[in-house]
């Protein structure tokens, strides 16, 4: 079995990627403290063609050497904005017509594998701080909670790993894939 070179993968250029349709998902980072995690979010959002990232509170913003280390340039291909508070970001996104979801273990959360995205709907998914999770005041403002089913003793994943799991679930939904450039 021969590995495929990057050139043979036929990836779009940053300019082509900017013009391509995106998944109707915006990722909101609620006070993420690790710059490496922020970079991983950028890279994951690029891989799954998320619309944008909204960085909030203490979450670091590009340009940053530490973010770049894990983003590998995705901080330049995924649109992003910054809000001083996550509350402001959630309010703005709600006004833009997004359904707001907390990726968190909360009462009434839907298990990710049972969640059914609605065609034509835009989603803003809030990922919380590495220690405290999504702030309670933000969870209170969300339309729904999403929980990743787990079997281990920790019932916890690194926040950027959680992003990969959740965004893959949205990306793999045929109802949301319309127009996406999905590789091999």
Where are these regions (language model features)?
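Post-transcriptional modification and biogenesis factors for structured RNAs
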Residues: 1-184
